[in-house]
Amino acid sequence: SQGIAQLMKKNKIEVFTGDASIVSVGQVQVGDQVLVTDSILIATGAEQKSLGPIAIDGQQIWGAREAMTPTALPARLLIVGAGAIGVEFASFYRALGSAVTLLEVAPNILPAEDTDISALAADALSQRGINVQVGQGLDGLASVDGCVEATIAGETLEFDAAILSVGVAGRVQGLGLDALGVAMDRGFIVVDERQQTSIPGIYAIGDVAGAPCLAHKATHEAMIAAETIAGHFVQGLQRDRIPGCTYSFPQIASIGLREQDAGDRALKIGRFPLYANGKAVVSGHTEGMIKTIFDAETGALLGAHLIGDSVTELIQGFTVAIGLETTEHELLETIF
């Protein structure tokens, strides 16, 4: 944060510290001051969701922040929610030696990923000793005598800690958005492709503006909003071209269309197992697959989904290819 403060100072950006609320279009109140401006950009991020009446207590029931700064390693750990964050923590704590149970109410872990990748990820986690349970909800969770008691499928199990990884919602409390009539959707601010909210002159970027909640997406949204506010034309955000990475063991990276979302669209699917790659064999990391999805008629690359060692370093090639609307034929002619 000190580095960011220096950047602000270097670029002559005036910083006001305090709780802010938007009192009207073009007016923001910070403490006793009212700041007048032509445009307002909301970048307040997101906050962790609780699970119904089950709240994060910071002791035995953790959110992501508490899970990153534990005072002791839990011998038995329950993770509720198997999205990217839940899977990352499952991999991390299992590598440290915890006995990990990963619980997901959806039919498969990593519900945002292509189902082939999700299935391979579940197998990989299970092989590493993680107890993966899908299609299973949590009936109850409570801290009891320094431990956590969880009720799953009618059975009460005991853990040393639990991580709630059930998603986030935009941090909008106290901003005054309801009074202004700013449109919301499932806890996030609704924006157009130029990041403007339903109220002209008010913009939103980052996690508060909705999924995917990724830092590189927020940075790009900031560029779009700044250029728009400055009166410059800029290409709007194309959400189908945002790469996502999960830093688990093995890693997962993806961009574009998932096969299960194609409907009746004619596709050409490519699957390449990493055990057929010489470098993977030599390095001893043969686990995983690269899956590509092309339009069967035009040959356009529509999606790429990867699982394996260091695949987060490979996704950028597919990101560029999709951005340039590259075809299967053009990729085949490319020397990598």
Where would I find each of the regions flagged by the language model?
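Short glycine/serine/threonine-rich phosphate/pyrophosphate-binding segments
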Residues: I61, I85-F89, A95, R171-V172, ...
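Feature captures the FAD/FMN-dependent oxidoreductase FAD-binding
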Residues: S1-S39, V132, D139-V148, L157-F159
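Rossmann-like dinucleotide-binding cores of NAD(P)H-dependent redox enzymes
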Residues: S1, A5, T69, P74-L78, ...
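Glycine-rich active-site/cofactor-binding loop and its immediate structural neighborhood
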Residues: S24-G52, W62-A64, T69
